[in-house]
Amino acid sequence: MKTLEYYEVIEYPVITEKTVNMISTTNRVTFVVNKASTKKAIKEAVEKLYAVKVKTVNVLFDRKNRKKAFVTLKKGFSAQDLANKLGII
């Protein structure tokens, strides 16, 4: 399998009422990512593209067969600032 570039790993942010609530309460942002991407690749892509530090990455496949990544940011980095940068909030 070939390695993916940073912009190929992250497809788009998920914008729902639940994910917007998670931004403010748990400092977590949700992305739909490439199915071939790993947690390590997702972490590197988020850190390089958005200039933040990632604490954890959790992934799941939803019913629409999309791979979602729940990215928790480290203390000192705000998910709300990242959401503003992405145009979510």
Model-derived regions, located:
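Contiguous, often N-terminal, cationic amphipathic patches that form binding interfaces
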Residues: 1-89
